[in-house]
């Protein structure tokens, strides 16, 4: 067993970045191997590492075990706080040919398409610790900017966290924590345990905390049919059918799969990503609040989950909450119904990081806006980080109190634009690699050229292509892709015509449709006309001469000039890029 783990660790060290190996693989230790059942048990020192290794590396470790023993091996990951101490004994350099079977050949057997041992998202060039520091456009790179913390920052002997499951609106009560205690374990004492209760379902989270804090956290939410005030006390009742689990990500509602590592970066989102990394490394100190806006499926949610996951890696005790705006509204309503606003406030006002998605859903919800205003003020005063996403710029949101709008504007506001062609291709290739499927580059370019709006549309198209290829037993080619997406491409081509583009642009820029064909050259007419030509080239299959004919019989060189000019300006002008995105979304319905 020791020989296996030495060889497996050596192989994983070759496949991973130094930071990934040091953080996730080095603390593991094999516990036992059953020769009869071929069952292998591997221990992790704390719950956070256990959950992450199971989700990200279990497949590769299982494959290495099967290859080593040349049999079907089942791998079980278990929790053992002493694992790190024993792990060092297994981390000696592996000797060539020491495997029981084919282990000495493992570095030739990484799963195709991943380049990183068979699991998605593990690419050295994209890891924060392995790439050049990020700098905001126009600024020099900052020392240490964009780096992951050292392995020591992940902490050994971390507490085990329990959390409720199946309850997205759960609100465990918590006492406010002084700003000085944040980032240092939030005032928790390693020897003190206390049940942390879920304010919606009455479920329990087992956490470690300071005795003084424990006395302030005695609220237990009522079960259904129970009077709100009957829940006070330290009891441990639970809703029937709900058992507490112990994944820190579920308690924070973070998706552990969404990280900076597997976030594809391009011109459209590089500023947002750089700002997100800066916030993740310095929460509450810069860019507070961070406000990200853009259309659906552009990566806003992925980015804010990445921030939360990075903070959890630095400090697993951090109080983090990801919540959609509609769920926050629901929390406010339930707190009102149960007369539990004190507990509601204690929880939300004591967070270290609040990630709230799609804030535009607060529109018209006056009581929710009032409660969020108080929470926002409390968090900022405590130097906690607030991150907000929306589909539009703060001042363009309707039905939101001016006080909130001014708070949203007080930090850093960054747009995430639709991905450019190269980025769309990169996204498709990375998604395909995650599925262990080889998609030819020309196919990725074909799909990216025809589908421009957002990442979800690209993912949906890729799934259709893969399913069509599997069902019909055909290799993925442009012809197969065209057949798989024929309905989608037909709908797009049918909906978008040059005439429709001209009308939409004329309405958007408040000119007459007739101006699209005229010879008038004032800037307020020529500019929209050039934009319409650009969109006609991008969104239809018309040739340059055909487009020129539809714009009053203009020469194809005039159309080409307009297309090149708008394309160049789009890459430099955020406002123009935003306008074009709005027009594209309008035309695509």
From Swiss-Prot:
GO biological-process terms attached to the record: DNA replication initiation; regulation of DNA replication
UniProt-annotated stretches for the region Disordered: 108-143, 156-197, 214-249
SMART domains given in the database record: AAA, Bac_DnaA_C
Database matches in Gene3D superfamilies: 1.10.1750.10, 1.10.8.60, 3.30.300.180, P-loop containing nucleotide triphosphate hydrolases
Taxonomy, superkingdom: Bacteria
Region (Domain IV, binds dsDNA): 470-589
Regions annotated as coiled coil: none
Stretches for region Domain II: 73-252
UniProt GO molecular function: ATP binding; ATP hydrolysis activity; DNA replication origin binding; lipid binding
An annotated GO cellular component: plasma membrane
Annotated compartments: Cytoplasm
Chain intervals for the UniProt region annotation (Domain III, AAA+ region): 253-469
CDD domains: AAA, Bac_DnaA_C
Chief site of localization: cytoplasm
Pfam families assigned: Bac_DnaA, Bac_DnaA_C, DnaA_N
Annotated stretches, region: Domain I, interacts with DnaA modulators: 1-73
PANTHER family assigned: CHROMOSOMAL REPLICATION INITIATOR PROTEIN DNAA
Domain notes: Domain I is involved in oligomerization and binding regulators, domain II is flexibile and of varying length in different bacteria, domain III forms the AAA+ region, while domain IV binds dsDNA.
UniProt subunit comment: Oligomerizes as a right-handed, spiral filament on DNA at oriC.
Function description: Plays an essential role in the initiation and regulation of chromosomal replication. ATP-DnaA binds to the origin of replication (oriC) to initiate formation of the DNA replication initiation complex once per cell cycle. Binds the DnaA box (a 9 base pair repeat at the origin) and separates the double-stranded (ds)DNA. Forms a right-handed helical filament on oriC DNA; dsDNA binds to the exterior of the filament while single-stranded (ss)DNA is stabiized in the filament's interior.
Family affiliation: Belongs to the DnaA family.
HAMAP family xref list: DnaA_bact (MF_00377)
Descriptive protein name: Chromosomal replication initiator protein DnaA
Organism the protein comes from: Cupriavidus taiwanensis (strain DSM 17343 / BCRC 17206 / CCUG 44338 / CIP 107171 / LMG 19424 / R1) (Ralstonia taiwanensis (strain LMG 19424))
The organism's taxonomic lineage, starting at the top: Bacteria, Pseudomonadati, Pseudomonadota, Betaproteobacteria, Burkholderiales
């Amino acid at each position: 067993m020791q020989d296996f783990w030495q060889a497996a660790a050596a192989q994983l060290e070759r496949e991973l970045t130094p930071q990934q190996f040091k953080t996730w693989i080095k603390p593991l230790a094999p516990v036992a191997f059953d020769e009869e059942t071929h069952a292998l048990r591997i221990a992790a020192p704390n719950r956070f590492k256990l959950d992450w290794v199971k989700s990200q590396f279990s497949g590769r470790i299982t494959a290495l075990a099967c290859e080593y023993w040349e049999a079907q091996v089942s791998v079980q990951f278990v929790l053992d706080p002493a694992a790190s101490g024993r792990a060092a004994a297994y981390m000696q350099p592996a000797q060539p040919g020491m495997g029981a079977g084919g282990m000495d050949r493992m570095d030739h057997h990484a799963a195709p398409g991943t380049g990183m041992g068979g699991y998605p998202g593990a690419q050295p060039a994209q890891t924060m610790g392995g790439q050049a520091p990020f700098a905001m456009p126009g600024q020099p790179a900052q020392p240490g900017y964009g780096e992951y913390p050292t392995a020591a920052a992940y902490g050994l002997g971390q507490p085990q966290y329990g959390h409720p499951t199946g309850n997205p609106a759960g609100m465990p009560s918590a006492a406010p924590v002084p700003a000085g205690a944040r980032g240092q374990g939030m005032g928790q004492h390693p020897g003190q345990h206390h049940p942390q209760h879920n304010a919606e379902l009455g479920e329990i989270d087992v956490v470690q905390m300071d005795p003084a804090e424990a006395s302030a956290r005695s609220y237990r939410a009522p079960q259904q049919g129970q009077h709100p005030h009957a829940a006070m006390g330290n009891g441990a009742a639970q809703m029937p059918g709900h058992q507490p689990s112990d994944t820190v990500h579920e308690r924070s509602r973070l998706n552990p799969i969404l990280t900076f590592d597997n976030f594809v970066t391009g011109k459209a989102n590089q500023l947002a990503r750089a700002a997100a990394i800066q916030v993740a490394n310095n929460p509450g100190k810069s860019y507070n609040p961070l406000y990200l806006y853009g259309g659906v499926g552009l990566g806003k949610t992925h980015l804010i989950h990445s921030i939360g996951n990075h903070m959890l890696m630095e400090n697993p005790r951090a109080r983090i909450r990801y919540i959609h705006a509609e769920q926050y509204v629901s929390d406010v309503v339930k707190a009102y119904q149960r007369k539990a606003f004190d507990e509601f406030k204690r929880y939300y006002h004591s967070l270290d990081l609040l990630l709230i998605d799609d804030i535009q859903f607060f529109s018209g919800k006056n009581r929710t806006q009032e409660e969020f205003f108080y929470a926002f003020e409390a968090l900022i005063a405590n130097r906690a980080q607030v991150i907000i996403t929306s589909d539009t710029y703060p001042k363009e949101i309707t039905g939101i109190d001016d006080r909130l709008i001014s708070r949203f504007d007080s930090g850093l506001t960054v747009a995430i634009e639709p991905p450019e062609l190269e980025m769309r291709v990169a996204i498709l290739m990375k998604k395909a690699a995650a599925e262990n499927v080889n998609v030819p580059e020309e196919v990725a370019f074909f799909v990216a050229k025809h589908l421009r709006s957002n990442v979800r549309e690209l993912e949906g198209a890729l799934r259709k292509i893969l399913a069509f290829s599997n069902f019909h037993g055909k290799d993925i080619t442009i012809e197969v892709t065209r057949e798989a997406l024929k309905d989608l491409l037909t709908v797009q081509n049918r909906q978008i015509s040059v005439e429709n583009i001209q009308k939409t642009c004329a309405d958007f820029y408040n000119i007459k449709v007739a101006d699209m064909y005229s010879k008038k050259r004032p800037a307020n007419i020529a500019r929209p006309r050039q934009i319409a030509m650009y969109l006609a080239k991008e969104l239809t299959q018309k040739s340059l001469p055909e487009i020129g004919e539809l714009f009053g019989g203009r020469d194809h060189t005039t159309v080409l000039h307009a297309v090149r000019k708008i394309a160049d300006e789009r890459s430099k002008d955020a406002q123009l890029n935003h306008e074009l995105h709005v027009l594209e979304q309008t035309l695509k319905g």
